[in-house]
Amino acid sequence: MALIVQKYGGTSVGTLDRIRNVAARLKRTRDAGNQVVAVVSAMSGITDGLIKMARELTENPSERELDVLLATGEQQSIALVAMALQEMGMDAVSITGRQAGIFTTGSHTRGRILNMDPSLMRGFLDDGKTLVVAGFQGITPNGMIHTLGRGGSDLTAIAVAAALKADVCQILTDVDGVYTCDPRVVPNARKLPEISYDEMLEMASSGSKVMQSRSVEFAKKFGVIFEVRSSLNDNPGTLVLEEHPNMENVVIRGISIERSQARVTITGIPDEPGMSGRILGAIGEAEINLDMIVSNIAPAGLARHSFTMHSSDLGKAQAALKPVIAELGPNAKVETEGGIAKLSAVGIGMRSHSGVAATMFKALGAAGINIGMISTSEIKIAVTVDETLIEEAARAVHDAFGLDRSPQSGIGWVAQDG
């Protein structure tokens, strides 16, 4: 008897008919002789609706109270799924994050899983019950309700699978796997049978809507192999697992794009120790996530720093940098640029193959697309381009690496589903 963890997002449980479909799928899995644990998100639109109500009451709602409020969304959906299962004759029980033994730490609305006590879940499973667990939530050691932030239900599913030593973990969504690129941008993108943790992490940090990176990090840390697949059919999806030697045969696993980026360039920085720390420290204190960072020294001995961020953080970054720039001297100034996007090519085969950057840059040049910034890691090459050209850029690079020609040519994109 296998123990299977299945995660269903908000779209999958967005209506009562969809809840019945989820229950029917869980019943089929159980009837096949398996133990089943479902991890469920709030119904589609519920979380946003709760946030809207809170902000209508107050411009700055307490994050503690937001956690208490938002946790009710998942409690609604798990109860409804359990009821649907019971109507089908199954012995099902819903449990909250607290009852599941998910202990968290960190800030309210952005909790991190600290540890787990799966004893209650094990007891229910030993009694033959099917479990429906609330995603997105846990409890602090001192008893406060915590939500896990964006992608929290995926993280819950991975953590539950690790704690219970599940045989299978499935992330079920409304598309059928991970693709070489967003099929809405590249129509000939292909579904991948598998992808490594490291490639998935790079894709997650580069704009791919597959999963949040911390869910993949958690899976890698605890060795949880999981599958991204459709909740609408039984077709195989995409396995996410530790890399193996055959994976290096594919140079590029896939292409990701990230829109709504902005670039900040600081010029005239004294070339002295500690300058970078002061600048980036101010950005960090403002809780702004930076992406690409490029530094160089001008002939006059003054440094130049450029970095990218989400365009929504641009105003906050300018405010945070204002006092720092004033301290750097009369030559220092800040320039900003919006309307850019990031294109990334990812693949562990880069470690053992040369010429990847040349192929990518030639493809962009042939398409008449100018490159702004360039950033590389061991398994990723990323560039910025004009945001209006990002889709054309993605298609050009996708074609240049032939990602449409083999089902093993790449990784990529999947819709976020709660």
What are these regions (language model features)?
Residues 1-216, 385-386, 405, 411-418:
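Nucleotide/pyrophosphate-binding catalytic subdomain
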Residues 34, 90, 224, 288, ...:
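Short phosphate-binding/catalytic loops that engage adenosine nucleotides
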Residues 40-48, 179, 228-246, 301-302, ...:
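Terminal amphipathic helices with adjacent charged low-complexity linkers/tails
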Residues 168-172, 226-228, 291, 372-373:
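Short hydrophobic alpha-helical runs that function as membrane-insertion/retention elements
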Residues 212, 223-229:
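Acidic/polar loop patches that form or flank catalytic/metal-binding clefts of enzymes
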Residues 219:
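Acidic-aromatic/histidine active-site loop/patch
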Residues 237-418:
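A conserved regulatory-domain signal marking ACT and ACT-like small-molecule sensing domains
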